[in-house]
Every structure is written in structure tokens, then in C-alpha cells.
Amino acid sequence: MNRLAVEIPGLSLKNPIMPASGCFGFGQEYSKYYDLNELGAIMAKAVTPEPRLGNPTPRVAETASGMLNAIGLQNPGLEHVLAHELPFLEQFETPIIANVAGATEDDYVQVCSRIGESKAVKAIELNISCPNVKHGGIAFGTDPEVAHRLTKAVKSVASVPVYVKLSPNVADIISIAQAIEAAGADGLTMINTLLGMRIDLKTRKPVIANGTGGLSGPAIKPVAIRMIHQVRAVSNIPIIGMGGVQTVDDVLEFLIAGADAVAVGTMNFTDPFICPKLITELPKRMDELGISSLQELKKELLNQ
């Protein structure tokens, strides 16, 4: 019996560790470093209906304990991804989670209705941190009613389970999570980046051309842990946790907080081998701490 295995809707994971969307492309670059079959899953780069060039540069900047990015969902568009990117991933047994983004509800529905055409795609990750252009640019994920409606629309057309990625830039994460669960979401992924800014002292302007960017890396881990714990306290919905994972102890901390699996983002840029390293280290650390299975961890904090 594989004590690292995790079963959640649409995903039979050999282990709970995977690269987060936006930090792994579509896997081709990383496949030169190690066998992608080692991974629990792969969260692929965001896909929109049409190609996107992304935001002007500079769009990445280092910060203390993390980084800022404002990539702007640069991607080659749905047709290219279906024809060229996902076929590459079909050679691996590792389940693919397709990240989907858009500017309107119709954008999401269009991509989600077709992305499951690839036999590699076992689930969808719905990126609801995108600005809703029909409602003044407010992110889909900051309003429970809007998030509910979008999730329901996508569920009506998707051929694979739908996981919704929660934004931390909200006053009440629980109301957002409950609205999404009520709409039929199969799971949650959390958290996305926190909105941040850096100033260049010489130019007196933001370092990021876009002005603000998403803060990721170790700086946001305590926020991610807190929000996962909050949601787990009120729901049994499957959760893939992310936000600042660097070490195997971070992985265990996310699992104890209530996550079923864990995604690694920014650290892939620092160490391309981070995911296989964590997979190797996890059972050893479990032995050291007297942990027999991952399942015993998920509600340990709640039961105290």
C-alpha cells in the first residue's frame, strides 16, 4: 500500500506534491531535469480562449521572502494548447490539472467545455482571481454571488471535476468557499497570490510596470495556512493547498491545516528539482515524526 497516495475527485495521486500553475509552464522545460511521472499531478499554465501577450515588462521582481509578478496570463490560447501543449503531457501517467482563466463568464465556459478533450486532463483549476471586465474589473473571486454563478456555469459544461482557486484578497474567505461549494465545485485550491507593490527609489515609480503584482513565496505561507484551516473547519471539500512551500515540513504543515495535497510554486524557480526532492523527503520525515499516513493529519488540528 502506498501511504503517500491521495484520492480526490478526478485525481488519483501517487503522492500529494505537485507544481503550481504558472511556475511550471506545460512541463516541457522541467521534463529535461526529471521524469514527470514522479509528480503527484501537474497544474498546467493558465489557458484563455485567445492568445495573450501578457503585461508589459518588467513584470517580475524579487521581494523579501518572495517575489512579485504581473505576468498577465500570457499564453498561446486554447487551440494551440489543445494541439501542441497537452499532447506532450499525454505521454506521462501523471494527471494534469488544467488552469483556466478569462475576462468574462463566457470565456471560462468556452475553455472549460473543451479542455477536457485532452485525455491527459483529469481536472480543471478555475482561476477566479481574474478581473471581470463586465463588472468594472472586480475579480470574480471577491464576490460570493459572482463566484457561485461562474462555478455553476462551468460545472454545467465541464467533462472533468472542477477545482476553484481562491483569492486571498478578500475580507471573508469562508463565505467565498461556501458559495463555490454550494455551486457544485469538486474542490478548492488555495491560495492564489496576495496583491503587493514595490517602489524603485531612483525612479520613484513601481518596480512592476503594471504597478502592482501578485506576492508569492514564503512570505505568504502563514496566510495560506490560516485560510486553509478556516475553510477546513466548516467544510470537508477537497483542498489543494499552496502558498510559500519550501520544505517538507511546510508540506506537513499544510496537510495538518486541512489540505489534501500541496502545490509548490515559486520555489520551482529557485530549485527546479524541488518537487522530486520533497517527494523523496516526505516519507522519511513522516517516519521521524511518527506519522503513519497522510489521512490522519487532515483533521488533527480541528480535533485538538
Swiss-Prot record:
Reactions catalysed, as given in the entry: (S)-dihydroorotate + NAD(+) = orotate + NADH + H(+)
Listed cofactors: FMN
Pathway: Pyrimidine metabolism; UMP biosynthesis via de novo pathway; orotate from (S)-dihydroorotate (NAD(+) route): step 1/1
Entry EC number(s): 1.3.1.14
One Gene Ontology biological process: 'de novo' UMP biosynthetic process
UniProt-annotated location(s): Cytoplasm
Residues that bind substrate: 45, 69-73, 127, 192-193
Protein name: Dihydroorotate dehydrogenase B (NAD(+)), catalytic subunit
Gene encoding the protein: pyrD
